[in-house]
C-alpha cells in the first residue's frame, strides 16, 4: 500500500517561481500544494517566500501511514515559532499579516521508528490588489455616469466571483486529500481482514486434519487377532 503512496508522493512542487515583466520587482505570490513521503524517524522542512502585509493560510493532512499523525511547526522569517503541534492528523493555520521573507514549515516523524507517513499540505496566499493598478484600470474606461451599470458594481461582482472560485478550488483539493486518506485506511483494513481470514481458514483446516487423525487412532486396533 505504501508503494502506491510513494508514487503519489512524486507529485511536482507547484510553487513555481514567476518571471516578472517590465520593471524588476518581487514575483507575485502563488498558491501551491504538495504531497510527499516522510520516512520513519526523519524530519523534513520547506521554505516559502512571502511578501509583507499579506495573509498566509497553511493546511496540512496526513493521508497515509500508521497512526495518521505527524509533528508540525511553522516559523517566521525572523525565526519566531508561530505554530507547534504534536501528533496531529491535520491542521489549518493562518498568519496575518505576514512578514517579508521565507517562512519555514517542518514536518517531524521522529517519534515513529517503523512507519513512514504520506503528508499533503497546501499554502494559500491572499493580499489586497495594488491600488495604483485598480485606479489605472478604472481610468482606462469611460466615466461611470455614461454606463448603465456602475463600474464599481462590476468590479465587486468580479472580485466576489474570483474569491468564490478560488475557495472552491481549495475545498476540492482538501476533499481529494480526505479521499486519499480514507482510501489508504480502507486498503490497510482490507489487508488486515484478508490476512486474518486466511489465518483463520488455515487454523480450521489444521484442526480438521488433527480431528480426523485422532478419530482414526481410536478405531485402529494394534492387538493381534487370535487364530
Curated annotation (Swiss-Prot):
Record localization: Cell membrane; Endoplasmic reticulum membrane; Golgi apparatus, cis-Golgi network membrane; Endoplasmic reticulum-Golgi intermediate compartment membrane
Transport as UniProt keyword: yes
Keyword Coiled coil applies: yes
Motif (COPII vesicle coat-binding): 218-219
Transmembrane regions listed in the UniProt entry: 195-215
Extracellular side: 25-194
Signal peptide (UniProt feature, chain positions): 1-24
Motif (COPI vesicle coat-binding): 218-227
Cytoplasmic topological domain residue ranges: 216-227
One Pfam family, short name: EMP24_GP25L
SUPFAM superfamilies hit by this protein: Supernatant protein factor (SPF), C-terminal domain (SSF101576)
GO CC terms: endoplasmic reticulum membrane; endoplasmic reticulum-Golgi intermediate compartment membrane; Golgi apparatus; plasma membrane
Membrane topology: Single-pass type I membrane protein
GO terms of biological process kind: protein transport
Domain GOLD: residue ranges: 43-125
Keyword set, alphabetical order: Cell membrane, Coiled coil, Endoplasmic reticulum, Golgi apparatus, Membrane, Protein transport, Signal, Transmembrane, Transmembrane helix, Transport
Tissue expression from the record: Widely expressed.
Coiled-coil ranges from the UniProt annotation: 145-170
Quaternary structure (record): Homodimer in endoplasmic reticulum, endoplasmic reticulum-Golgi intermediate compartment and cis-Golgi network. Interacts with IL1RL1. Interacts with RNF26; this interaction is important to modulate innate immune signaling through the cGAS-STING pathway.
Similarity comment: family membership: Belongs to the EMP24/GP25L family.
Task of the protein: Potential role in vesicular protein trafficking, mainly in the early secretory pathway. May act as a cargo receptor at the lumenal side for incorporation of secretory cargo molecules into transport vesicles and may be involved in vesicle coat formation at the cytoplasmic side. Plays a positive role in IL-33-mediated IL-8 and IL-6 production by interacting with interleukin-33 receptor IL1RL1. Plays also a role in the modulation of innate immune signaling through the cGAS-STING pathway by interacting with RNF26.
Protein name (record): Transmembrane emp24 domain-containing protein 1
Species this protein is from: Mus musculus
Amino acid at each position: 500500500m505504501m508503494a502506491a503512496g510513494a508514487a503519489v508522493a512524486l507529485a511536482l512542487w507547484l510553487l513555481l517561481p514567476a518571471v516578472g515583466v517590465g520593471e524588476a520587482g518581487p514575483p507575485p505570490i502563488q498558491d501551491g500544494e504538495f504531497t510527499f513521503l516522510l520516512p520513519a524517524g526523519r524530519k523534513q522542512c520547506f521554505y516559502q517566500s512571502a511578501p509583507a502585509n499579506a495573509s498566509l493560510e497553511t493546511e496540512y493532512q496526513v493521508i497515509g501511514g500508521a497512526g495518521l499523525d505527524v509533528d508540525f511547526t511553522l516559523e517566521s522569517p525572523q525565526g519566531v515559532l508561530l505554530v507547534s503541534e504534536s501528533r496531529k492528523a491535520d491542521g489549518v493555520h493562518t498568519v496575518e499579516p505576514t512578514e517579508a521573507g521565507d517562512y519555514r514549515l517542518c514536518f517531524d516523524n521522529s517519534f515513529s521508528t517503523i512507519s513512514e507517513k504520506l503528508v499533503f499540505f497546501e499554502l494559500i496566499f491572499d493580499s489586497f490588489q495594488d491600488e495604483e493598478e485598480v485606479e489605472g484600470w478604472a481610468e482606462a474606461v469611460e466615466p461611470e455616469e455614461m454606463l448603465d451599470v456602475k463600474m464599481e458594481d462590476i468590479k465587486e461582482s468580479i472580485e466576489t466571483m474570483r474569491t468564490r472560485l478560488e475557495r472552491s478550488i481549495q475545498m476540492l483539493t482538501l476533499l481529494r486529500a480526505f479521499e486519499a486518506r480514507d482510501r489508504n485506511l480502507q486498503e490497510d483494513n482490507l489487508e488486515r481482514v484478508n490476512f486474518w481470514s486466511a489465518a483463520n481458514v488455515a487454523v480450521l483446516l489444521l484442526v480438521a486434519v488433527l480431528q480426523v487423525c485422532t478419530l482414526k487412532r481410536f478405531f485402529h486396533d494394534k492387538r493381534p487377532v487370535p487364530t
